[in-house]
């Protein structure tokens, strides 16, 4: 797939991003990425066995045990601001 100025402008609009640096450099980088993905698509993987886990026989299961935990309190203790059981963050949407 050839990436040109027109396609880059369309991608910029669709992604709601603004590319302000050297556009030629950006086009070259995107072209390299697309070419690499196209090479990956050329690989014949039909003869390969599907791998769900790297551990033979799958991951060992563990028994679910009910334990008392203060994870919420421990996490909130690290927060700069908290209120009851919630993080307090600056308002970003008006």
Swiss-Prot record:
Gene Ontology MF term list: asparaginyl-tRNA synthase (glutamine-hydrolyzing) activity; ATP binding; glutaminyl-tRNA synthase (glutamine-hydrolyzing) activity
Record bears the keyword ATP-binding: yes
Record keyword Nuclease present: no
Keywords carried by this UniProt record: ATP-binding, Ligase, Nucleotide-binding, Protein biosynthesis
EC number: 6.3.5.-
Domain of life: Bacteria
One Pfam short name: GatC
SUPFAM superfamilies assigned to the protein according to its UniProt record, in alphabetical order: Glu-tRNAGln amidotransferase C subunit
GO biological process: glutaminyl-tRNAGln biosynthesis via transamidation; regulation of translational fidelity; translation
InterPro entries per UniProt: Asp/Glu-ADT_sf_sub_c, GatC
Enzymatic reactions: L-glutamyl-tRNA(Gln) + L-glutamine + ATP + H2O = L-glutaminyl-tRNA(Gln) + L-glutamate + ADP + phosphate + H(+); L-aspartyl-tRNA(Asn) + L-glutamine + ATP + H2O = L-asparaginyl-tRNA(Asn) + L-glutamate + ADP + phosphate + 2 H(+)
Family: Belongs to the GatC family.
The protein's role, per its UniProt record: Allows the formation of correctly charged Asn-tRNA(Asn) or Gln-tRNA(Gln) through the transamidation of misacylated Asp-tRNA(Asn) or Glu-tRNA(Gln) in organisms which lack either or both of asparaginyl-tRNA or glutaminyl-tRNA synthetases. The reaction takes place in the presence of glutamine and ATP through an activated phospho-Asp-tRNA(Asn) or phospho-Glu-tRNA(Gln).
Subunit structure: Heterotrimer of A, B and C subunits.
Protein name (Swiss-Prot/TrEMBL): Glutamyl-tRNA(Gln) amidotransferase subunit C
The species this protein was found in: Campylobacter jejuni subsp. jejuni serotype O:2 (strain ATCC 700819 / NCTC 11168)
């Amino acid at each position: 797939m050839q990436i040109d100025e027109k396609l880059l402008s369309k991608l910029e609009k669709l992604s709601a991003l603004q590319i302000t640096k050297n556009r030629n450099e950006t086009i070259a980088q995107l072209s390299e990425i697309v070419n690499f993905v196209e090479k990956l698509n050329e690989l014949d993987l039909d003869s390969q066995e599907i791998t769900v886990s790297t551990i033979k026989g799958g991951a060992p299961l563990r028994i679910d045990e009910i334990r008392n935990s203060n994870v919420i309190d421990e996490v909130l203790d690290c927060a700069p601001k908290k209120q009851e059981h919630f993080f307090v963050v600056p308002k970003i949407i008006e």
